[in-house]
Amino acid sequence: MIVRRQNRRFTIMAAGPRGSGKSSFFNSLIGKEIVTSRGHEGIDLYMLNLDCEGIMQRITLIDTPGFGEGFDDSEIQETICNFIKAQLDMFIAEESKIRRNPKYEDTRVHCLLYFIPSTSSSLKSRDIAFLRKVSGLVNIIPVISKSDGLSITERIEVKRQVMEQIKHYNISIFDLDDPEVYSSPAAGNDLNSLVPFLVVSADRENFESRARNYQWGDVSIDNPDHCDLPALRELLLSTHIYGLIDYTASEIYENYRAAVLEGGVRK
């Protein structure tokens, strides 16, 4: 049984290839420019208080270096993977203290959004390698970015290809329809059928108007007929916050902790 405690910090990480729209997605998710353009290869954390359905929620957004084309990005992958592990290790260390810090704040990563460019018809070898590294260490939700460039047929096909690969390579992704992880019955509305989520981010100057402008017209990022951002935003900022937090604590962390205590080697 999941025990819910309100106002715990919720941490979302974005990872994926360069130019896949990670920073723009975060800004569109929040509705204003929070994450700036990256000019380095480090991991950036943005901490904020956000009104989520009338509750002020403490949220951390983590923007990571993008994987590149034409060069070995294994070091970047290891950096991100080690960051996720480090947060789990810090929690183990705090939990093992005789006198715990009453003000200690959980920094574990509760959700990893993995961005797949719409120009890819499927997961590339680098995507598969990374996802296999972090599978079981964090709740993974795959996302197809800049999906407004795809036809309806292409959207269906790329989703099918990605899901087949996820199953083939035994990559563990978060079960959005598990009744233990959402806060209201209405939230469990076959969200797994939307995975990977098709998202479109607003133009930099249009975060508040929630649109992407083209010569032929506008794409509303809040229109479910245009993309899956409305459903993804609702689960991230409302219905699945505590489910993602609790699953991290009760399943991911406990499995990791058991492996560490038994001397197991993590991937």
Curated annotation (Swiss-Prot):
Name of the coding gene = CDC11
* Entry keywords, A to Z: Cell cycle, Cell division, GTP-binding, Nucleotide-binding
The disulfide bonds in this chain are: none
Family assignment? Belongs to the TRAFAC class TrmE-Era-EngA-EngB-Septin-like GTPase superfamily. Septin GTPase family.
List of residues binding GTP:
16-23, 66, 146-154, 212
Q: Fetch the CDD domains from UniProt.
A: CDC_Septin
**Any idea where the Septin-type G domain is?**
6-263
Quaternary structure note: Component of the septin complex.
Region annotated G1 motif sits at 16-23
- Segments for region (G3 motif): 63-66
Physiological role:
Septins are GTPases involved in cytokinesis. The septins localize to the site of cleavage and act as a structural scaffold that recruits different components involved in diverse processes at specific stages during the cell cycle. Septins are also involved in cell morphogenesis, chitin deposition, cell cycle regulation, cell compartmentalization and spore wall formation.
* Protein name as annotated: Cell division control protein 11
One Gene Ontology molecular-function label: GTP binding
Which segments carry the region annotation G4 motif? 145-148
Record organism: Encephalitozoon cuniculi (strain GB-M1) (Microsporidian parasite)
Q: Which InterPro entries match?
A: G_SEPTIN_dom (IPR030379), P-loop_NTPase (IPR027417), Septin (IPR016491)
Q: Name one GO cellular component term.
A: cell cortex
Biological process (GO) annotations held by this record are:
cell division
